[in-house]
Amino acid sequence: MGSVLLDCAHRAAVPAGGALAVDRVTFSELVEAEVAARPNIEVVHGEVTQIPEGHVVIAAGPLCSPALSEEVMKLVGGDALAFMDAAAPIVDASTLDMDVLFSQSRYEEQGSGDYLNAPLNKEEYEAFIEALTTADRVVLKDFEGGDLFQACQPAEEVARTGKDAIRFGAMKPVGLTDPRTGRRPWAAIQLRAENKEKTAYNLVGFQTNLTFGEQKR
């Protein structure tokens, strides 16, 4: 297809089974370099407070400044804007207990694959769900709406919809075998490398609005 972004993504790719996942720092640097190298693109560093005339693509973020927000609201109306923040927990690889975790991508041989898996039995899962749904969350700011994008909800919100909801989502155990028991676990948390050095891991599907203190717990 000749996509520059896809080329950058493949160059910044980290092991993720059949998915395309990237080292976010490397990917950002590659995209920035590509943009800066284009002779037909002028890069201007500074705050935009007014929307220019003509055809414009506005991609402000992660949080739009008040001045630009007001300009956008003049065009689309204040009720059309929403903001919801969610953090994606990243775990230091040195803190992982490799006596419990096992390496396997779904439906592949044990010991193979690009994911680490933390297996949970029924009792561990239920205790985890109880802790997840009762943990302290970040208090929403006045500009943050409560309407959530259904396909990318915080893990605690998914868990609140039913005790087994997340077990059929981010924590589904299908295609996995716990080498300690030789059986499929009741549930599992998958971890994917954040970088090629594998010094940090991302909890797959665990975007959250919990406070940082609760995330550490």
Give the ranges of each region predicted by the language model.
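Predominantly flavin-linked oxidoreductase catalytic cores and closely associated redox partners
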Residues: 25, 29, 34-215
